[in-house]
């Protein structure tokens, strides 16, 4: 897992969010119209920025994300139960740039329609600091088609997690083994489980990554494998995995 540096692109992120907020102000009626998360996630420039921050990788499983498959993840969940709100806002404020003074808890329904917002801080549901790019949770579980929402963003829901990507030592905290499994401290078990990062599809993908590194397979070979099925199969042919015919043909193409 990689560290996501939200400070590096802070100015660009704030510029997009400020422009979004300004655009939603209606001077005629002196109020905001459609100032909400669903409108923000339509802005392509914002998605591109999040992908750039993450070098194109999913914040959780580290697969490359095609732009049309990007989902936006609220690190501090969009909606918190009233009885847990105070505790969880305090909890998430310890990570990254989720500190008070930069963002504040405010789901869509609580964003005031007037007067104009003075930012920063930003409502957490539309704050650059609180949003990262995730995949669709696409995995293979047999049959002809992949299943969505089986890991990462949508699988998590509103579960309380440790946002590991906001810890500078993230790559050391969660380590990839050559057999595709993950090793991590026991205190992160619930986070890994909430994200389903030990799903068999993800384990298989990590085996492939390990083989590429261990066998010094060149970038040129990897790029050729994207369009050449024979090369792709040759790269993964000695992995001891059963019943991955469809996975070999499809999933590895986008993630080698």
Where are these regions (language model features)?
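Hydrophobic alpha-helical segments that mediate membrane insertion or helix-helix packing
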Residues: 58-61, 245
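Beta-strand-connecting loop/turn residues
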Residues: 56, 68, 73, 179-181
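Domain-exit/linker segments immediately C-terminal to small folded modules
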Residues: 117-241
